[in-house]
């Protein structure tokens, strides 16, 4: 998943974990037309993580629709706190995930 030159000879597992720990993830709510709410997840490096696969995982766990585009994940509805819990379960450090109210 990671480029070998970025790891400096570290094992891929350690390099991948370091990459996850460096992510600063912001979760916010955006109001759209007709009062619809969309949860926006930003700050995940799309070069290191497959955003479409992560979006698919979140959509199935939350039973909602959504998409991954423009370097961010958009989920239909207000799922800010549940998304944070799922991202922590997937290995992202809780202190690097911010919910913007």
Swiss-Prot record:
Keyword check for Protein biosynthesis: yes
Record keywords: Protein biosynthesis, Translation regulation
GO biological process: formation of translation preinitiation complex; regulation of translation; translation reinitiation
Protein name: Protein translation factor SUI1 homolog
Database matches in PANTHER family: DENSITY-REGULATED PROTEIN (PTHR12789:SF0), DENSITY-REGULATED PROTEIN HOMOLOG (PTHR12789)
Organism of this sequence: Aeropyrum pernix (strain ATCC 700893 / DSM 11879 / JCM 9820 / NBRC 100138 / K1)
A GO molecular-function annotation: mRNA binding
Alphabetized Pfam families for the sequence: SUI1
Family membership noted in the UniProt record: Belongs to the SUI1 family.
Signal sequence interval, chain numbering: none
PROSITE patterns: SUI1 (PS50296)
């Amino acid at each position: 998943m990671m480029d070998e030159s970025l790891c400096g000879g570290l094992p891929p597992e350690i390099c991948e974990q370091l990459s996850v720990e460096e992510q600063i993830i912001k979760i916010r709510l955006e109001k759209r037309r007709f009062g619809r709410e969309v949860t926006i997840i930003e700050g995940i490096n799309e070069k290191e993580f497959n955003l479409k696969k992560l979006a698919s995982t979140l959509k199935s766990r939350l039973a909602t629709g959504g998409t991954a585009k423009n370097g961010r994940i958009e989920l239909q509805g207000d799922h800010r706190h549940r998304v944070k819990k799922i991202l922590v379960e997937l290995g992202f450090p809780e202190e690097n995930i911010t919910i913007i109210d």
